[in-house]
Amino acid sequence: MDLHQLLKYRLTGANVVYEIPTENNLQNSPWQANPLKYEFSDSPYTPLSSQFECDNLSALTNTPDNQSSTETISAQPISPLEADSSYRQAGILLQENIQVGADPLYATSRHNMQHALREIETVLMAPDTDDATTSTKHEFEEIKPAQLVRQRSRTWSHESRQPLPGVGRSQFASGGYPTASYEFRPEKRQRELREDPQIIVKQLLTRCAEALSEDRTEEFHKLVQEARGVVSINGEPIQRLGAYLLEGLVARHGNSGTNIYRALKCREPESKELLSYMRILYNICPYFKFGYMAANGAIAEALRTENNIHIIDFQIAQGTQWITLIQALAARPGGPPRVRITGIDDPVSEYARGEGLDIVGKMLKSMSEEFKIPLEFTPLSVYATQVTKEMLEIRPGEALSVNFTLQLHHTPDESVDVNNPRDGLLRMVKGLSPKVTTLVEQESHTNTTPFLMRFGETMEYYSAMFESIDANLPRDNKERISVEQHCLAKDIVNIIACEGKDRVERHELLGKWKSRLTMAGFRPYPLSSYVNSVIRKLLACYSDKYTLDEKDGAMLLGWRSRKLISASAWH
């Protein structure tokens, strides 16, 4: 059996139908969530300098309209030309009270200056109305936009107002303003702020996380109530994700994250129902499908001449990864090999699914009979960290393959347990001398990062995941809601609400996995370029927003600019 045969069964053997979905016109917000605080400071690059020059301050009046802002704006001349007598004669002092010169010429441009001030208020995230608002403790740190507007330095200081829902300091995470396409159109900008749930939800949730991390309990409760009004399991991707993130924050505040996570696991649907949800996720989220595809391609290539194969699958779940590989092995020109699969699943997951590993065994037995391939299934209900060589019963003459698919991040590392079970497991596997070891993992770093950084990373990662689901399944589809609740929500809650040994969702980036595997004695086994080319073509059938990158023999699958899944092989 060669890779072409394996991929043939990947495409046709499992009755997989590829349809080009209607692209969902999701807008990518220029504002990114970030838990850091920002303060407006002395920046020569602020766009205010081009819109609010001292020599353009023709007139201001001391009317209620012009005193509606509670912000303090100070214009300080930095050159002799700007400090000349004509500038001083204007008597303009932009402090708590606005004073103007008595020259009647200034009154003629009152309307223009009112418009200029409204533009400035828009940039500073002021509310829609002209009514004075209460200042908050939030401050902006120095921000420099990507595009240089004016080289002349100005100092603009202010205390930020209580922002609109989702409009605050955190939206400046990218360190700048929109680029050249940005226009000073107050009405349009305010409408965009009101209508874009990306801005509203992300900023509200970030403020909730900040208040929680700083023990500002009263503010946290108020923000939670505000956030509940803009999240929904039926809304935009960020609104759906926000519903689960918010529950994670509430659970963390109540120290109930662990109980909620365990309850979610115990409330998993029955085996057949969960298997159905996982298959839906498998079909609408090609990351998992093509992660399996890459791993199976590496296994097929490494074992192509072997007649006695033993696959050890840590966290076998529903066993769907092996359907197409078994079909391909059964079609070998010289006859199928003997296949033995050891499926490992932790007792909690097995209990939650009812029949547990039995249903996986029944499925594999049915496939064995249908495709006439000698197949033996050995269930092993034990935590991965407790697996020993003796449990695996390695037999002489077996060509061994070990598979870690979205599982290894569940194993604690040195930050949780001084014995470092994660690296210990890899060393144990290396001691088995497998012909190939495959690893598929989420491309995220939620392992040792502090809470606020972890919250921002989780929101960014799953935002891309939820957006990609929208590209392939209608938003009002009831199955989509069930898939997100049963397959994704519990992971999100665990990352946000739990700590210590109770936080089992501890993702790491490919670079970190590479370091761990190398220290355990593994060497990279480059994935087939043919497999990668086929995956690249199939991704295009879903959406042109999917990406595939090859790095050091590994494969990275993503949505837009966000990498979501890594697949690699080792020996």
Curated annotation (Swiss-Prot):
Residue stretches of biased makeup (Polar residues): 61-77
Per the record, which residues fall in region Leucine repeat I (LRI)? 199-259
Residues covered by region (SAW) = 497-571
Please give one Gene Ontology molecular function term for this protein. Answer: DNA-binding transcription factor activity
Q: Name one GO cellular component term.
A: nucleus
Give the matching InterPro entries: TF_GRAS
Spans annotated as Leucine repeat II (LRII): 359-391
Q: Which Pfam families match?
A: GRAS
Q: Where is this region: VHIID?
A: 278-343
User: Any idea where the GRAS domain is?
Assistant: 192-571
Induction info reads:
By oligosaccharide elicitor (N-Acetylchitooligosaccharide) extracted from the rice blast fungus (M.grisea) cell wall. Strongest induction by chitin oligomer with greater degree of polymerization (heptamer). By inoculation of M.grisea in rice cell suspension culture.
Q: Which domain of life is it from?
A: Eukaryota
Q: Show the segment(s) annotated as Disordered.
A: 61-80, 151-180
Keyword set, alphabetical order: Nucleus, Transcription, Transcription regulation
Q: What does this protein do?
A: May play a regulatory role in the early step of oligosaccharide elicitor response, downstream of the membrane-associated high-affinity chitin-binding protein.
Q: Give the family this protein belongs to, as stated in its UniProt record.
A: Belongs to the GRAS family.
Q: Which PANTHER family match?
A: OSJNBA0084A10.13 PROTEIN-RELATED
- The protein depicted here goes by the name Chitin-inducible gibberellin-responsive protein 1
- The source organism is Oryza sativa subsp. japonica
